[in-house]
Regions:
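Conserved nucleotide-binding/hydrolysis micro-motifs of P-loop NTPases
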Residues: 76-79, 121-124, 163-164, 191-195, ...
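Conserved interdomain linker/interface between the two RecA-like ATPase lobes of SF2 helicase motors
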Residues: 196-249
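N-terminal pre-P-loop "Q-motif" helix
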Residues: 2-28, 119
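Walker A/P-loop
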Residues: 25-49
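SF2 helicase catalytic motif II
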Residues: 122-184
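Conserved Walker A/P-loop ATP-binding site and its immediately adjacent core
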Residues: 43-48, 58-94, 119-122
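Post-DEXD/H (motif II) to motif III coupling segment of the RecA-like Helicase ATP-binding lobe
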Residues: 167-216
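Inter-Walker segment of RecA-like/P-loop motor cores
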Residues: 91-139
Length: 249
């Protein structure tokens, strides 16, 4: 386990309370936005959230659910990165069991503490192996159905880098999520595109204060706009600065 920074602890607390409130709501496909700047440790914070909820819900009198099934969807190869990170972060506690599709229990569905990691590109096509029907009936949608019916678990989907599911991917993303029908969608991004009443924000300055990321670097700070230079482009100003320096030498 790693020690969380103060802003990370605060974000996890807020996410946890909002998640419990939303689990108590009977509506499906509720959206919880988690906005944090790049470098803030979003994977660590979300993993900690899942760990704490998995351990605390069975003893929590506030929530109508004592167990939850988790599905973590990420673009490109980020799901593998998050999968490995979670295995490393929580290897001692063993409250969470990160799994890939082939490692799941396809007879009874996802179990409490299972976190299914999926690559977005592997499920966003009609002929994708995880989606299309087969003789063994081993599909993502059948796995989710069994999780809900056999295990009686609500499904929470973590959408990592949520902004990448928008634009030309928006229609297909909606079709997949509509088929999964999660109870909650935790949408994680530095630049989220979805709007929701439920949101947790990590301020960039708080991350900078903890020295997790640095302030923006000002390139060529001595190149200032002035009345004389106002009509010049940036490149022209840089060139003029270089020529002036050359004359000095």
């Amino acid at each position: 386990m790693i020690e969380l920074r103060d802003y990370q602890k605060k974000a996890v607390r807020e996410l946890k309370q909002k998640m419990i409130d939303m689990l108590n709501d009977s509506e499906d496909r509720q959206k919880l936005i988690f906005k944090a700047p790049t470098g803030a440790g979003k994977t660590v914070m979300v993993s900690t959230l899942l760990d704490e909820l998995t351990r605390d819900l069975p003893m929590n009198g506030q929530c109508r659910y004592s167990r939850v099934a988790w599905v973590w969807i990420a673009p490109n190869k980020l799901h593998q990165q998050s999968y490995r990170s979670m295995r490393n972060f929580f290897s001692e506690r063993r409250s969470l069991r990160p799994v890939m599709f082939d490692e799941c229990d396809h007879v009874d569905g996802l179990h409490p503490g299972d976190v299914l990691f999926l690559n977005w590109e592997s499920i966003n096509k009609d002929n994708a192996v995880m989606i299309r029907d087969n003789e063994q009936n081993r599909t993502l949608y059948e796995l989710i159905r069994k999780t809900k019916i056999e295990q009686h678990l609500p499904v929470v989907v973590i959408i990592d880098e949520e902004h990448m599911f928008a634009g030309r991917n928006a229609k297909k993303s909606e079709m997949v999520l509509q088929a999964i029908q999660p109870h909650i969608e935790l949408r994680v991004s530095a630049t989220p595109v979805t709007q929701s009443y439920h949101a947790v924000l990590v301020k960039r300055q708080d991350v900078i204060n903890e020295e997790m990321i640095k302030k923006g670097i000002e390139l060529n700070p001595n190149v200032k706009s002035s009345k004389e230079q106002s009509e010049l482009t940036v490149n022209q100003r840089l060139l003029k600065k270089a020529l002036d320096k050359r004359k000095e030498l």
